[in-house]
């Protein structure tokens, strides 16, 4: 669970990045203080070090792009046997072509007969 300090520093880093200003611990602390948020003194330093090592714009653009274990499994299937991968879409198309079965319809057991 994130804390107020993490959120405040995250927003400060995004503001600085958006404005094209160099991201430093002092600037993060200044923005957080201007917002009236009280945080522990180590947060700005941690976020400034992160911004030095990572491209913040890339991090923002890739939010939610990570996947669980599903992508490697799907990528491994064509490598293992291409025929099986081709057969799966054909099965899906076959299912789509079939008309939907009618519901049970009126069987004479009406609730308000």
UniProtKB/Swiss-Prot annotation:
A biological process from GO: translational elongation
Family matches, as InterPro entries: P1/P2_N_sf, Ribosomal_P1/P2
Keywords attached to this entry: Phosphoprotein, Ribonucleoprotein, Ribosomal protein
Annotated region described as Disordered, given as residue ranges: 86-113
Cellular component terms (Gene Ontology): cytosolic ribosome; plastid; ribonucleoprotein complex
Modified residues (Phosphoserine): 103
Pfam families, per the entry: Ribosomal_60s
Single GO term (MF): structural constituent of ribosome
Subunit structure: P1 and P2 exist as dimers at the large ribosomal subunit.
Protein role: Plays an important role in the elongation step of protein synthesis.
HAMAP family: Ribosomal_L12_arch
Family statement: Belongs to the eukaryotic ribosomal protein P1/P2 family.
Name of the protein: Large ribosomal subunit protein P1y
Organism for this UniProt entry: Arabidopsis thaliana
Lineage: Eukaryota, Viridiplantae, Streptophyta, Embryophyta, Tracheophyta
């Amino acid at each position: 669970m994130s804390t107020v300090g993490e959120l405040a520093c995250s927003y400060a880093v995004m503001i600085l990045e958006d404005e094209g200003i160099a991201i430093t611990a002092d600037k993060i602390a200044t923005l957080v203080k201007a917002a009236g948020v009280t945080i522990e003194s180590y947060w700005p330093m941690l976020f400034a070090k992160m911004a030095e090592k990572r491209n913040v714009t890339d991090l923002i653009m890739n939010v939610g792009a990570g996947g669980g274990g599903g992508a490697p499994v799907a990528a491994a299937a064509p490598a293992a046997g291409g025929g099986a991968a081709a057969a799966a879409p054909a099965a899906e198309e076959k299912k789509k072509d079939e008309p939907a079965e009618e519901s049970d319809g009126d069987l004479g057991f009406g609730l308000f007969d």
